[in-house]
A protein has these predicted regions:
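Conserved, short, structured surface segments that act as functional micro-motifs
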Residues: 76, 82, 100-181
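Zn2+-dependent peptidoglycan hydrolase active-site motif and core
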Residues: 28, 45-98, 117-127
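Flexible, active-site-adjacent loop/turn segments at secondary-structure boundaries
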Residues: 3, 7, 87, 144
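Short loop/turn segments at secondary-structure transitions that flank enzyme active sites
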Residues: 39, 92, 130-134
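Intrinsically disordered, low-complexity acidic/polar segments
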Residues: 42, 95, 135-137
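Surface-exposed, glycine-biased beta-strand/turn segments
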Residues: 1-72, 103-104, 113, 151-182
Length: 182
């Protein structure tokens, strides 16, 4: 996935989505992870929709595929009960079906630009819904959990980008450490 990453949970968007963890309405409820370089994305655009996809999307934890839509799927974790949404997958190349049981790390599909018949940029939009005391099941910030998983895989701490040219669309949300998935 393309680096640097930045947290874009709670960014202002046009859709009327809310989260009790965001101070604004009309917010982004997940984390966008860009895939590939500009050259790789141009090469994918030349491919048929069935072929498109550069990076695999994998199961976050052991669980059951509970929903497959026109451009997304949902995995419910068996240990945590968290619901993970994987959006903009190549729906023609899914490796799973509804009610399939998966293990953490199993390939479920490939990231593409599907958006219900309208293409978007090549990226994975990743969401986590989890229980938050007093709020019920709500969208929670996935960014720190993704960074933690990356650092575990790489066997070390990631590099913080201090470049002032990387803009942040909205202020990051300070989250309760109990919401993080290790």
């Amino acid at each position: 996935y393309s680096m640097p990453w930045r947290d874009n949970f709670c960014e202002t968007r046009t859709s009327n989505r809310t989260s009790p963890l965001c101070s604004l309405n009309k917010v982004h409820q997940g984390q966008d992870l860009r895939t590939g370089t500009a050259t790789e994305c141009l090469q994918m655009r030349a491919q048929s929709p069935r072929e498109r996809g550069l990076h695999e999307a994998v199961a976050t934890e052991d669980g059951i595929i509970q929903y497959i839509g026109s451009y997304s799927l949902q995995l419910k974790g068996t240990e945590t009960g968290f619901i993970y949404s994987y959006v903009h997958l190549n729906m023609r190349r899914l490796q799973v079906s509804v009610m399939d049981t998966v293990k953490a790390g199993d390939v479920i599909g490939v990231v593409s630009n599907d958006f219900g018949g309208t293409p978007t940029t090549y990226h994975l939009h990743f969401e986590i819904k989890a229980p938050v005391e007093g709020e019920g099941i709500v969208h929670v910030p996935p960014y720190t959990s993704l960074v933690s998983a990356y650092e575990r895989r790489e066997g070390g701490i990631g590099r913080v980008v201090e470049d002032e040219t990387v803009e942040v669309a909205s202020a990051p949300v300070i989250v309760d450490p109990s919401w993080l998935i290790d």
